[in-house]
From Swiss-Prot:
Family: Belongs to the UPF0229 family.
Region named Disordered: 64-109
Annotated PANTHER family: UPF0229 PROTEIN YEAH (PTHR30510:SF2)
Compositionally biased intervals (Gly residues): 92-107
InterPro entries per UniProt: UPF0229
Name listed for the protein in its UniProt record: UPF0229 protein PFLU_5583
Domain of life the protein comes from: Bacteria
Organism, as annotated: Pseudomonas fluorescens (strain SBW25)
Length: 423
């Protein structure tokens, strides 16, 4: 069987629809490969796609054929090995294989089909079915944004938006309409001239008359301009209202001395995944980074992920700072407020009840969703149990999970931000 492999660069995305159909068809294979890649890769290593392997048997089209079962009565002329009533042993079918092993002299098979998905496709499968819970519209009056969308073709517009194909098509149609009858007459005149020259070569009068008519018709056709201002077509772009929800995500990370370097790395990887998810799925969202030990500070993205500052542990300092920023910059009646907190669970004993009170009275009534991840292989401490009481009071808007190793990051992340059915 012959195979044709199209290796064109596909610069105009002419095969995009076919590719999307293929990705939908083998979504389960691709999603499984993406999940394995996420657990294998570093979270920061998301700047390229992934190679996906699909077993050859899974890409075969269904085929109806005769099975090997059943009994058949066949006459074999010159048979010297079998007599009536004996059963002929079924031939053993050769099977293809792959991987290391010794060479064989029989068997056929098919290699796995391997293809590459882009970074955009990788992230799409990675964050599929994830969303910020309870995202609602707040204060839509006067906060509409606009996005520019294609709205067909216009006869007027900016020269930079000229549609060349539609312009040439319009010009071609106009030339046909204006010169169609002249071209038909010209064609008839040329045929008549050819007939006269062939059958009546001495009829100079008629020949000269037809040649003059041909010249007049040709001049009339050439006077039709190749391109006219009437032909110009432009891509029409209009501004479409795009009501947007304003959302802010608070990222609170414990960098105290009790956090080992491995624990800090897991926390950073969790927040990198969260940051990537937010920027990938939401056009307009503010992210506030807060680092804390005995005191809390709002920092930028670079310092949040790479600063080496450390100290003691007072978790309430981060919650107090978050509440102050909410009151100052993010009023709850205008913003969808989210928070994600990561810690190893160690905290000054007298501070854990304070954390609970701040959350219950000053933060939870105003946020859409609050997540807490505790990174520890040990038994939970006072902070975890205080947060469990918060979860009982705010079951729909508070969630907590435990991380033990880096391999838990992606499954826990999906559990926290899994799309919920709205009833």
């Amino acid at each position: 069987m012959s195979y044709v492999i199209d290796r064109r660069l596909n610069g105009k995305n002419k095969s995009t629809v076919n590719r999307q159909r293929f990705l939908r068809r083998y979504r389960d294979h691709i999603k499984k490969a993406v999940e394995e890649a996420v657990s294998r890769r570093s979270i920061t290593d998301m700047e390229h796609g992934e190679q996906i392997s699909i077993p050859g048997r899974d890409i075969d089209e269904p085929v109806l054929h005769h099975g090997r079962g059943g009994k058949q009565t066949v006459v074999h002329p010159g048979n010297k090995e079998f007599t009536t009533g004996e059963h002929i042993q079924r031939p053993q079918g050769g099977g293809g294989g792959k991987g290391p092993g010794k060479a064989g002299n029989s068997g056929e098979g098919m290699d796995e089909f391997v293809f590459q998905i882009t970074q955009e496709e990788f992230l799409e499968f990675m964050f599929e079915d994830l969303e910020l819970p309870n995202l609602v519209k707040r204060n839509l009056t006067g906060t509409d944004t606009f996005k520019t969308v294609r709205a067909g073709i216009s006869n007027e517009g900016n020269p930079s938006r000229i549609n060349i194909i539609r312009t040439l098509r319009s010009a071609h149609a106009r030339r046909i309409a204006l010169s169609g009858s002249s071209r038909a007459k010209l064609r008839d005149a040329k045929e008549e001239l050819a007939r006269l020259k062939r059958e009546e070569p001495d009829n100079f009068g008629d020949i000269q008359e037809i040649e003059a008519e041909i010249e007049k018709l040709s001049a009339r056709i050439h006077r039709v301009p190749f391109l006219d201002t009437f032909d110009l077509k432009y891509n029409l772009l209009v501004k479409q209202p795009n009501p947007s929800s304003k959302a802010v995500m608070f990222c609170l990370m414990d960098v105290s001395g009790s956090m080992t370097q491995a624990t800090k790395d897991i926390a950073k990887r969790f927040f990198i995944l969260l940051y990537l998810f937010l920027k990938r799925n939401y056009d307009k969202i503010d992210v506030v980074f807060i680092r804390h030990h005995t005191s809390a500070r709002e920092v930028d993205e670079e310092e949040f992920f790479y600063s080496r500052e450390t100290g003691g542990t007072i978790v309430s300092s981060a919650l107090k700072l978050m509440q102050e920023i909410m009151a100052e910059r993010y009023p709850a009646n205008e913003w969808n407020i989210y928070a994600a907190q990561a810690s190893d669970g160690d905290n000054w004993n007298d501070d854990s009840p304070i954390c609970r009170d701040i959350l219950i009275n000053q933060i939870m009534p105003f946020v859409q969703y609050y997540t807490y991840v505790e990174i520890t292989p040990r038994e939970h401490q006072a902070l975890w149990f205080e947060y469990e009481r918060i979860g009982e009071a705010f079951a729909d808007t508070f969630a907590q999970q435990q991380l033990v190793s880096a391999g838990d990051i992606y499954p826990v992340f999906r559990e926290l931000f899994q799309r919920r059915l709205v009833t």
